[in-house]
Amino acid sequence: MSYGCQVSDDEPNGSKAVSLLLRLSTLALALTSAVVMATASECTVVQLNGVVATITYKDFPPFVYLVGFNIAAAMLEAAAIYLRLSTGGGDDDDEGFKGKLPGILLVVIDVAVQALVYTATGGAFAAVSAYGPQINACGAGAGRFCGQVHQSKLLSFAGSAAVGLAVVFRDVSLPFSLWPTSSD
């Protein structure tokens, strides 16, 4: 008779739980980054020649890419979460190709999400470096555009880290379990 801790012959599922948590974080961070950038308040500035100009994120192509790429990455990450939860990631060897297809799709989606989020983040950092004076002109007193650009950039960076770690923990076995395993 055993009291206290239950000993199980099942493999620990800690890596699946950590990977799922990081996937959910990626989804939330990428989507939040896109929303913050898309809702960046407009900024009106007077240029050196006296012309009044309104600046939005759409005036900077890398920011438009950030919004589009992060939304696409969030949708793909939602599909990856669904695949992971509904099929377990296609780890079954006894079903042939049909059993391995979800695992193959998961790898393809992981690569696509990484490419989209890394590209969006890199583009945003490059744009802030290249267009610094124009973005900083919308700093204090001229609206929240500058602050929202920096928030979106950092959220996208955090999403980049989360997606990379999710893929690592998908393949690394962690020696603990976070939810009960099946009692079949």
Curated annotation (Swiss-Prot):
GO cellular component, as recorded: plasma membrane
Taxonomic source organism: Oryza sativa subsp. japonica
Extracellular side: 38-62, 122-153
UniProt superkingdom: Eukaryota
Alphabetically ordered keywords of this record: Cell membrane, Membrane, Transmembrane, Transmembrane helix
NCBIfam families named among the record's database cross-references: A_tha_TIGR01569 (TIGR01569)
InterPro entries linked: CASP/CASPL, CASP_dom, CASPL
Topology of this chain in the membrane: Multi-pass membrane protein
Keyword Transmembrane helix set for record: yes
Positions of transmembrane segments: 17-37, 63-83, 101-121, 154-174
Protein name (Swiss-Prot/TrEMBL): CASP-like protein 1U2
Assembly: Homodimer and heterodimers.
UniProt cross-references to PANTHER family, sorted A to Z: CASP-LIKE PROTEIN 1U1, CASP-LIKE PROTEIN 1U2
Similarity field: Belongs to the Casparian strip membrane proteins (CASP) family.
Side Cytoplasmic, residues: 1-16, 84-100, 175-184
